[in-house]
Amino acid sequence: MAAEVKTVIKPLGDRVVVKRIEEEPKTKGGIVLPDTAKEKPQKGKVIAVGTGRVLENGQRVPLEVKEGDIVVFAKYGGTEIEIDGEEYVILSERDLLAVLQ
């Protein structure tokens, strides 16, 4: 029996891979929302980070976020991908709006 190999995601340059954090599927009034009515969350956990942005002089600037950070990102930023049945978003650092602490 062959062992299952898990795919490793390694973003390039100033990109990060984020796994969305799903919010409670209820409104403040207690109404349960169906999946079709929910917006995708704009908050997630950083799974992997690239090596950083390269300046014109060749110097590499490391990213301000690290693996494990919880971030808020732009609503329409990034590229959604599915790997090993899990959904992720690949974002440029400029699409990250804040780190939650």
UniProtKB/Swiss-Prot annotation:
Gene Ontology BP term (one): chaperone cofactor-dependent protein refolding
Transmembrane segments: none
Record has NAD as a keyword: no
Single annotated GO MF: ATP binding
InterPro entries per UniProt: Chaperonin_GroES (IPR020818), Chaperonin_GroES_sf (IPR037124), Chaprnonin_Cpn10_CS (IPR018369), GroES-like_sf (IPR011032)
One Pfam family per UniProt: Cpn10
Location in the cell: Cytoplasm
UniProt keywords, alphabetically: Chaperone, Cytoplasm
CDD domains: cpn10
Broad class of the protein's primary localization: cytoplasm
SMART domains in the record: Cpn10
GO CC annotation terms, alphabetical: cytoplasm
Cross-referenced PROSITE patterns: CHAPERONINS_CPN10
Known function: Together with the chaperonin GroEL, plays an essential role in assisting protein folding. The GroEL-GroES system forms a nano-cage that allows encapsulation of the non-native substrate proteins and provides a physical environment optimized to promote and accelerate protein folding. GroES binds to the apical surface of the GroEL ring, thereby capping the opening of the GroEL channel.
Assembly and binders: Heptamer of 7 subunits arranged in a ring. Interacts with the chaperonin GroEL.
Listed PANTHER family: 10 KDA HEAT SHOCK PROTEIN, CO-CHAPERONIN GROES
Similarity section: Belongs to the GroES chaperonin family.
Protein name: Co-chaperonin GroES
Lineage: Bacteria, Thermotogati, Deinococcota, Deinococci, Thermales
